[in-house]
Amino acid sequence: MDFSSKIAINKGWSDDKKYCVTDHKQQKYFLCVSDKEKLDSKKFEFDMMEKVASLGVPMCKPISIELCGDEVHSLHEWIDGKDARETILTVSKEQQYTYGVEAGNILRKIHSLPVTEDREDWEPFYNRKIDDKIKKYKECPVQYENGQIFIDYLNANREWLKDRPQVFQHGDYHIGNFMIGEDRKIYVIDFDRFDLGDPWEEFNRIVWSAQVSPSFASGMIDGYFDDKVPDLFWKLLAIYILTNIVGALPWALPYGSEEIAVMQNQAKEILEWYEDMSQIIPSWYLNKKTAE
């Protein structure tokens, strides 16, 4: 397809190149350009996006994927709108909560896709992940203030990882990967971290949502569970959030002091939410009545 204009989009952590392209009929599209080494993973991602789109999920629907020389080009519908993270606070708390409920409903649809791949049981797989992150954290020259609380909690609560189901995951599900369209609807974007795992692990990045909008984060949980949140969810959510934050400091190290400070601040906030892990439901969680 020939395009009359091509504007680079410089956002996100992906090493893919992203563009807003326009054809000769002034129709806009989203173009993602990847190295040809990623062809197989990009084909899988494209296939998964087609399946998600077929469920009626609001998103940049996939149109085509092809190898162009040394590059993989995947073309998607364009959404006119703004990043949810930048616009969510311009609407009422009730509307923030409603957007969160919709995000939870979308996630439940994504998790309904049938999984045919064989996968190792979740408990041994995730325990290795915890061990690896704790090891790297202990080797890290920088530490969190009171970081040992995270490690002690993880080691004392691994039993909850038993017998967990596994589903297809979006892989990076938080407020930074949503857009609010000009039609005021919410759209999910950035499917390039698709994975398999415990459906509830998908909430491990809800920290980013809660820091921006507790109403959105709370709505996401209520929407996913249709207002019936099981006790086990809170136990596992704490494990998944803490595993992430323990692994975040060694990850941030190469990016420098600014990124390290972001993670140290997040670790401090997590301890405040959980009162040094003495309570299991984070303090930002608002049920439907208090969100309104």
Describe the role of every protein-language-model region.
Residues S92-K93, Y187, N204-V207, N265-Q266:
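Glycine-rich, phosphate-binding/catalytic loops in enzymes
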Residues A8-D121:
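ATP-binding pocket architecture of kinase catalytic cores
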Residues D16, V101, K162, R205, ...:
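Helix-rich C-terminal or lid/interface subdomains of diverse kinases
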Residues F30-V33, I63, F168-G171, V188-D190, ...:
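Short beta-strand segments
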Residues G56, E66, K82-D83, L107-V115, ...:
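A general structural signal marking secondary-structure boundaries and capping sites
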Residues M1, S112-G171, D222, M263-M277, ...:
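An alpha-helical support segment within catalytic cores of ATP-dependent transferases
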Residues K17-T22, L154-F203:
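Active-site acidic catalytic loop and adjacent metal/ATP-binding pocket
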Residues H24-Q26, L67-D70, E182-K185, L242-I245:
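Short strand-connecting beta-turns/loops that link adjacent beta-strands
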